[in-house]
């Protein structure tokens, strides 16, 4: 034992290393691994950051980073009030709000239902305003524009009555809301604004903005008080556009969108919206019975603060007779046309062309088609022909009032007496008014697919795009 200790005391360093080489190997392996990890940590950290950034951008696109802008747009139509809340990223792409791409709320009746009580008219928006503002982050509310665009229903009340209501709405926003109100935030939209906003909305959602005009789609929007037609035309047609009659808006609006200049034919036909057209058609028969009213019905139709007799003929409703009355109300008369091509009432039709080859038809066209049962109300778009409206009209005109709910279960009770009238008018508007062939395919649109979402195809989105783009 002593000899062994003596030998151990005289071992060289090399001998010791050789004798304990196994132990040293075991100790050195984790040390080397730790050193390698420390050496590689900066590179690994960068890689992790890049992966996280890529994944976040893949999940949310450009929407998940950078500033966001909100816009609150009220559509004060003749048939009701609606509010849209949109959120955009820095590239003007829509950002989801909760589980939808917009907040959309509506209620009835519209502002024009209170022509003699401006305060009550304005207060009808309170519920919509409170819910819309609550959806905007608190810190962004002072810079979030709010607009109230009144359409044809309010225009029909006359200047003074409509201005009194608008002033009451301005006072409501000022006293109740923290949202940003611009100088012209509350106004009656003119026809070119409403029509052009609708065109921008649908082409924005279809992602056709920035493409040649012939790749865009034309839009017909049938509201309650007016109907708008808008489509892009070539520059040479815009240069030769006739001057509108005094008091009418210009036929052509120049717009610069997504890096391309468009010449947009747009015209709004006041008093030709569906609810206004009912009044015009009832005016034709004056105080006598009307061939467009459902058999067995006798009542009064109210629109724009006026009452109109709405009573069926003793022989019942008649599609052919109703068509005659509708054509009369539309003023389809070529002698009024002083241009090469007209729609009705002597109005230039824009000349047609590539921007009109694909027509998207919105609002009441979709609603009545769904209620009449020839399109699925749960689908955002449907391809139909004007003939489909005529076929549905034939069924509605042969209906007695008491069998209305069984034949047309989706139609609201208040609309049943006028279903024959509505469908005949829509067919007449498309074929005799806008000159479409009865067999031409058109696209009825309620919502437009935008990524994984379906967005309401209404003019407020076009207004919101303009609002958030303004300095």
Swiss-Prot record:
Active site residues per record: 194 (proton acceptor)
Organ and tissue specificity: Expressed in roots, root hairs, root cap, leaves, stems, trichomes, phloem throughout the plant, guard cells, filaments of young stamens, stipules, papillae of stigmas, pollen, pollen tubes and the abscission zone of siliques.
GO cellular component: endosome; Golgi apparatus; Golgi medial cisterna; Golgi membrane; trans-Golgi network
Statement: the UniProt record of this protein carries the keyword Translocase: no
GO molecular function: apyrase activity; ATP binding; GDP phosphatase activity; UDP phosphatase activity
Cofactor: Ca(2+)
Reactions listed under catalytic activity: a ribonucleoside 5'-triphosphate + 2 H2O = a ribonucleoside 5'-phosphate + 2 phosphate + 2 H(+)
Lumenal side: 43-471
Localisation: Golgi apparatus membrane; Membrane
Glycan-modified residues: 333
Key words, A-Z: ATP-binding, Calcium, Glycoprotein, Golgi apparatus, Hydrolase, Membrane, Nucleotide-binding, Signal-anchor, Transmembrane, Transmembrane helix
Keyword Hydrolase: yes
EC number: 3.6.1.5
CDD domains: ASKHA_NBD_AtAPY1-like
Residues noted as binding ATP in the record, renumbered to the chain: 72-82, 218-228
Summary of the function given for this chain in its UniProt record: Catalyzes the hydrolysis of phosphoanhydride bonds of nucleoside tri- and di-phosphates. Substrate preference is ATP > ADP. Functions with APY2 to reduce extracellular ATP level which is essential for pollen germination and normal plant development. Plays a role in the regulation of stomatal function by modulating extracellular ATP levels in guard cells.
Record family assignment: Belongs to the GDA1/CD39 NTPase family.
Protein's UniProt name: Apyrase 1
Gene assigned in the entry: APY1
